[in-house]
């Protein structure tokens, strides 16, 4: 006899009340990824330029990074976040725009760190583009 299928109920997202957090900004040449975590590294909110509807070369613009930062910051502030430290990684165009957008939303930025990985002469970089 076949077993009866149970209804699966989806749990609602539980709002975590976190006052201090870390904003990780990963800015590449093609996209900007913003993740807001608590001090242990558990993700509270995230947003990317591509996730917001920017496609192609528009993903890498400072405006797209600004919109991503605002979106992630609003969700984090709904969870009670007030002060953040900022870790910036990568060479992209959206670095400064994302930090300014975070400050404009009302989050208090206590520290800004550049954690871009620098090779000790590791892999060969891609060749220069000739356009």
From Swiss-Prot:
Coiled coil ranges (UniProt) are none
What's the name of the protein? Answer: Small ribosomal subunit protein uS11
Q: Which GO cellular component terms, listed alphabetically, does the Swiss-Prot or TrEMBL entry include?
A: ribonucleoprotein complex; ribosome
Q: Which gene encodes it?
A: rpsK
Specify the species. Answer: Exiguobacterium sp. (strain ATCC BAA-1283 / AT1b)
Leader sequence range is none
- Of which family is this protein a member? Belongs to the universal ribosomal protein uS11 family.
Family annotation (InterPro entries): Ribosomal_uS11, Ribosomal_uS11_bac-type, Ribosomal_uS11_CS, Ribosomal_uS11_sf
Give an example GO biological process. translation
Query: In its keyword annotation, does this UniProt entry include Signal?
Result: no
Top-level taxon of origin: Bacteria
Q: What does this protein do?
A: Located on the platform of the 30S subunit, it bridges several disparate RNA helices of the 16S rRNA. Forms part of the Shine-Dalgarno cleft in the 70S ribosome.
Query: What PROSITE patterns does the annotation carry?
Result: RIBOSOMAL_S11 (PS00054)
